[in-house]
From Swiss-Prot:
Lineage start: Eukaryota, Metazoa, Chordata, Craniata, Vertebrata
Reactions catalysed, as given in the entry: creatine + ATP = N-phosphocreatine + ADP + H(+)
Function: Reversibly catalyzes the transfer of phosphate between ATP and various phosphogens (e.g. creatine phosphate). Creatine kinase isoenzymes play a central role in energy transduction in tissues with large, fluctuating energy demands, such as skeletal muscle, heart, brain and spermatozoa.
Protein name listed in UniProt: Creatine kinase B-type
GO cellular component, one term: extracellular membrane-bounded organelle
Organs and tissues of expression: Expressed in almost all tissues and found enriched in various region of the brain, retina, heart, gizzard, gut and sperm.
Length: 381
């Protein structure tokens, strides 16, 4: 748990060598960047809310690596963190986001009409489609650093705003503290709710403090539009449904997200955003669009093929296990989504998923017949 602010002056009594973390066995982006010299340069800085370098890196110190994905190993505690600790964050962002430079500008496109196709992904292979993003409310600290009062204020504000949604987005808020364990587990199993805070990344960064205080889920009546409140980000906005109509999912996502932003503005709150980093979120891996468009897809043959990883890489896609980031694939079902978040617009990322998934299905059909997929190998996108 972060506690460095109160101890930062105490730490200064010890030399840089005494305080520098042992990163010798680490495989994360932070550990690649944080040299002794950089630690020395940044260790006495803090943001105006008191977030320090040790708060930024603690999750990456405590979690050397991950078997399935290269983790980032650092978090922001407020909007200022990305500026105050830019000498650490900029190279991490460049490394994680495919060479995104400190001078680059991000683009946003939430017009679902610009998406080509996507309403006809084969439902025999695509079990469900989902698009999610995160949003942070300007003026509050982020989850690794916010106080109980801030968290409760974010919950109150969000529930009031979401309560104004109408039509097929009309819904209700369910606070975690009012749910039984069984109700919570059912929502988790149905992929509607975030897991209980057992992930070491959540725990070490301090995001799980005071759990389940001021956490909850808001969803519309048919559970196709959901908002998680106060998990890894202030808000996680999710549009999802069974089958392969990604166009419908993305259209609902854009409509709902735009309405939510308007409702917050009417209360004089805006989302954290800047021209360079796009939407500001807790984890540097989610900067930019914060968008992950994913499908649960059955690929029992391609999933075992030696070229599966290379195909995904060329399509700028990534795979996760069936149950999400910390899990393995079950029954040949993978969670396949865009690998990028920053430097591409929302429409461009969903387009990559739609086009890529069509090719994956074509390859799977070939392999079912025992045929080669060599001529289908895509060029690098």
């Amino acid at each position: 748990m972060p506690f460095s602010n109160s101890h930062n002056l105490l730490k200064m009594k010890y030399s840089v060598d005494d305080e520098y973390p042992d990163l010798s066995v680490h495989n994360n982006h932070m550990a690649k960047v944080l040299t002794l010299d950089l630690y020395k340069k940044l260790r006495d800085r803090q943001t105006s809310s008191g977030f320090t370098l040790d708060d930024v890196i603690q999750t990456g110190v405590d979690n050397p690596g991950h078997p399935f994905i290269m983790t980032v190993g650092c978090v922001a505690g407020d909007e200022e963190s990305y500026e105050v600790f830019k000498e650490l964050f900029d190279p991490v962002i460049e490394d994680r986001h495919g060479g995104y430079k400190p001078t680059d500008e991000h683009k946003t496109d939430l017009n679902a009409d610009n998406l080509q196709g996507g309403d006809d992904l084969d439902p025999n292979y695509v079990l469900s489609s989902r698009v999610r993003t995160g949003r942070s409310i300007r003026g509050f600290c982020l989850p690794p650093h916010c106080s109980r009062g801030e968290r409760r204020a974010i919950e109150k504000l969000s529930v009031e705003a979401l309560g104004s949604l109408g039509g097929d987005l009309k819904g209700k808020y369910y606070a975690l503290r009012n749910m039984t364990d069984a109700e919570q587990q059912q929502l988790i199993d149905d992929h509607f709710l975030f897991d209980k805070p057992v992930s070491p990344l959540l725990l070490a960064s301090g995001m799980a403090r005071d759990w389940p205080d001021a956490r909850g889920i808001w969803h519309n009546d048919n559970k196709t539009f959901l908002v998680w409140i106060n998990e890894e980000d202030h808000l996680r906005v999710i549009s999802m449904q069974k089958g392969g109509n990604m166009k419908e999912v993305f259209t609902r996502f854009c409509t709902g997200l735009t309405q939510i932003e308007t409702l917050f503005k009417s209360k004089n709150y805006e989302f954290m955003w800047n021209p360079h980093l796009g939407y500001i979120l807790t984890c540097p891996s989610n900067l930019g669009t914060g968008l992950r468009a994913g499908v649960h897809i059955k690929l029992p043959n391609l999933g075992k093929h030696e070229k599966f990883g290379e195909v995904l890489k060329r399509l700028r896609l990534q795979k996760r296990g069936t149950g999400g980031v910390d899990t393995a694939a079950v029954g040949g079902v993978f969670d396949v989504s865009n690998a990028d978040r920053l430097g591409f617009s929302e429409v461009e990322l969903v387009q990559m998923v739609v086009d890529g998934v069509k090719l994956l299905i074509e390859m799977e059909k070939r392999l079912e017949k025992g045929q080669s997929i060599d001529d289908l190998m895509p060029a690098q996108k």
